[in-house]
UniProtKB/Swiss-Prot annotation:
Putative GTPase-activating protein. Keywords: ANK repeat, GTPase activation, Metal-binding, Zinc, Zinc-finger. Encoded by one of the numerous copies of centaurin gamma-like genes clustered in the q11 region of chromosome 10. ANK repeats lie at residues 631-700. The keyword Cell inner membrane does not apply. CDD domains: ArfGap_AGAP2, PH_AGAP. The lineage of its organism: Eukaryota, Metazoa, Chordata, Craniata, Vertebrata. Residues 271-286 have a biased composition (Polar residues). This is Arf-GAP with GTPase, ANK repeat and PH domain-containing protein 9.
Length: 703
């Protein structure tokens, strides 16, 4: 369709719109990840879909994600190019589509810089399904219009059978008129405000309505749907708008949604002024009738209890239930739609807690007993109201997809201020190809199938959806506000892994710096080299890189070497290093080194290796044991009980495996390691585990 757009640059076309604006057109494949990435940075998305082959699953997923997260405006074009058998007709259709794109989308008539108010007027007629398909889209950027103002401007359209306006069968409505639907209705969302666009069959007429006042939403209800079209009559006739209802916006600004559907034209039999109101019949599913019928069918018990009392009962007992647990932020009865194919609504008791979890129970009794519950994690979920876009969405006119395509409700949210009334036996649709006209049998008791507008949805990151419904608009808005606040609070309380790692690295760096600042740690423990960067976990000392290589050659039994800058340092290892240090270690390992020359920075590797081997492996310079009648194992047990670190290190240096693992003569037979664990002394526990202690050795009571 836009072959000359991408002829020069492949899949991308760049066009200058002055010195400060530039339009970039990117052709995207049917890939869900690519479509989402481009939609995040785009202002407008134009979807060209071949309706003859149906929607792909990627299209449905893309529309669902766009509606849940407030992505940009989407203009959908259902193409039927394969249905054209003649090249001349195909070229003509492509030319019309191209013209509409460049004159309506490219020329900035979408309304990106000003508010675009659009209301859906056209619907399907259930009186005669064989009537010609037509579309009526009204855009108003003027003061409230009366029916005389619209009729006097001639919102009518002449068409005849020769132009393909009347289709002889139901199937041909979607096949023979493919060119008209493709070129007209899907692009109607791009028409400039202050225009009235009426399309029937092959022709497209626009009537200007000029004014400078604030925009208002105008809604038209057809009432002359009982007249039939004479398929054999070749004379032209007019489509008249019979009744006009002016609905003012209640919430001021905000973005409204775009809709598209079809309505068959009805020949006008009179040119008199239209009436301003049509009294609803008994079968008209007005909001009042629909709400009362819903309560009487779903919530009225067999004994004739009052539904208002049932609704107030959970609120009266909200403060007296759920003892022993945290008090929820909000709780009450809501309707929940089942996920099964029946799609039935059942009453659930729903609670919202401060931990970011929404829980629903089958009944109030289940909540009191804390059984049969299901939880929804709000930290990975978002909330959505059908027909109402998120507050962060900046779209001026946003599309709505059919409920059959994305599982969302078809009803509009009246909280936005736009109210749409439906005539008897009328159902809205968005795609003439996907939603065929309903049969007369399908319209029986259709008012019972009307969904309420008090519902909201919770969509998780995995795509799972929960549908809830409140009794009133106020209650629904209260739930939505509470859930949104809890989602925000939960996300703000969760620290990212990056920030956690930064905090951990900062605290670890400060702890290692404090270890280097200890007395004696400014020089190597064996050769007095300045600023050592390596450590021995068994000994609790710092050393230079050359001495660390010698320590490694002795194996991990003697010394486990670790770098201060390259390795991770858990809390327990940092405590060992900060508790011992070079000064304390040398007072033990060099306690009897009188007359021996300690290596220096200028000493050779052989001299350093001899000193380290004599000091740690042969223990030639080790301080003597204290004079006592107790065995080494009993002394180690007493030092562990008294938490005497210096004595414990000296005893560990002199002791063997059997002496270190000696148990208490009386009591439960605990070793020194067991006593250190009971005391909670991490330093002694690490030293005993690193030397010759046996952690798996059971106590005398087999614990």
């Amino acid at each position: 369709m836009f072959e000359d757009v991408f002829s020069d640059s492949g899949n991308t076309g760049n066009f200058d719109r002055g010195k400060k604006r530039r339009l970039t057109i990117i052709e995207c494949g049917c890939d869900i990840n690519m479509m989402i990435d481009l939609a995040k940075v785009a202002d407008l998305v134009l979807m060209l879909i071949d309706a003859s082959f149906g929607f792909e699953m990627e299209m449905f997923e893309f529309l669902n994600i766009c509606q849940a997260h407030g992505f940009p405006k989407i203009l959908g074009v259902l193409t039927h190019l394969d249905s054209f058998k003649h090249n001349k007709q195909l070229k003509k259709t492509k030319k019309r589509l191209k013209h509409r794109f460049w004159t309506e989308v490219y020329q900035d008539k979408v309304g990106l810089t000003h508010e675009l108010v659009q209301s859906l007027i056209s619907t399907y007629s259930t009186i005669d399904a064989k009537m010609a398909s037509s579309r009526v889209t009204l855009l108003s950027n003027s003061k409230p219009l009366g029916s005389e103002a619209i009729d006097n401007q001639g919102v009518s359209l002449e068409f005849d059978q020769q132009q393909g306006s009347v289709c002889p069968s139901e199937s041909e409505i979607y096949e023979a008129g493919a060119e008209d639907r493709m070129a007209g209705a899907p692009m109607a969302a791009a028409v400039q405000p202050a225009e009235v666009t009426v399309e029937v069959g092959e022709d497209l007429h626009m009537h200007q309505v000029r004014d400078r006042e604030m925009p208002e939403v105008v809604e038209i209800r057809r009432s002359n749907c009982t007249n039939h079209c004479d398929l054999g009559d070749t004379s032209s006739y007019h489509t008249k708008v019979s009744t006009v209802h002016i609905m003012k916006k209640r919430n001021g600004g905000g973005s409204l949604n775009n809709y598209s559907s079809s309505i068959p034209p009805t020949p006008s039999t009179s040119q008199e002024d239209p009436q301003f109101s049509v009294p609803p019949t008994a079968n008209t599913p007005t909001p009042v009738c629909k709400r009362s019928m819903r309560w009487s069918n779903l919530f009225t018990s067999e004994k004739g209890s009052d539904p208002d009392k049932e609704r107030k009962a959970p609120e009266n007992h909200a403060d007296t239930i759920g003892s022993g647990r945290a008090i929820p932020i909000k709780q009450g009865m809501l309707l929940k739609r089942s996920g099964k194919w029946l799609k039935t609504w059942k009453k659930k008791y729903v609670t919202l807690c401060s931990n970011g979890v929404l829980t629903y129970y089958s009944s109030l009794g289940d909540y009191m007993k804390n059984i049969h519950k299901k939880e929804i994690d709000l930290r990975t979920s978002t909330i959505k109201v059908p027909g109402k876009w998120p507050s962060l969405a900046t779209s001026a006119c946003a599309p709505i997809s059919s409920s059959k395509s994305n599982g969302l409700s078809k009803d509009m949210d009246t909280g936005l201020g736009d109210s749409i009334c439906f005539s008897p036996g009328i159902s809205s649709t968005t795609s003439p190809k996907l939603n065929p006209p309903p049969s007369p049998h399908a319209n029986k008791k259709k008012h019972l199938k009307k969904k309420s507008t008090n519902n909201f949805m919770i969509v998780s990151a995995t795509g799972q959806t929960w549908h809830f419904e409140a009794t009133t608009y106020e209650e629904r808005d209260a739930w939505v506000q509470a859930i949104q606040s809890q989602i925000l609070a939960s996300l703000q309380s969760c620290k990212s892994s990056k920030s956690k790692s930064q905090l951990t690295s900062q605290s670890e760096a400060m702890a290692l710096q404090s270890i280097q600042n200890m007395r004696g740690n400014a020089h190597c423990v064996d050769c007095e080299t300045q600023n050592p960067k390596w450590a021995s976990l068994n000994l609790g000392v710092l050393m230079c890189i050359e001495c660390s290589g010698i320590h490694r050659s002795f194996g991990t039994r003697l010394s486990r070497v670790r770098s201060l800058e390259l390795d991770d340092w858990p809390v327990e290892l940092r405590k060992v290093m900060s508790s011992i240090g070079n000064e304390l270690a040398n007072s033990i390992w060099e306690g009897s080194s009188q007359g021996q020359t300690k290596p220096s920075i200028k000493s050779t590797r052989e001299e350093k290796e001899w000193w380290i081997r004599s000091k740690y492996e042969e223990k030639l310079f080790l301080a003597p044991l204290p004079c006592t009648e107790l065995s080494l194992g009993q002394q180690l047990l007493r030092a562990t009980t008294d938490e005497d670190l210096q004595t414990a290190i000296l005893l560990l240096a002199h002791g063997s495996r059997e002496e270190v693992n000696e148990t208490c003569g009386e009591g439960d037979g605990c070793t020194a390691l067991h006593l250190a664990c009971r005391k909670g002394n991490v330093v002694l526990e690490q030293l005993l585990t690193g030397w010759t202690s046996w952690p798996e050795m059971p106590t005398g009571t087999q614990r």
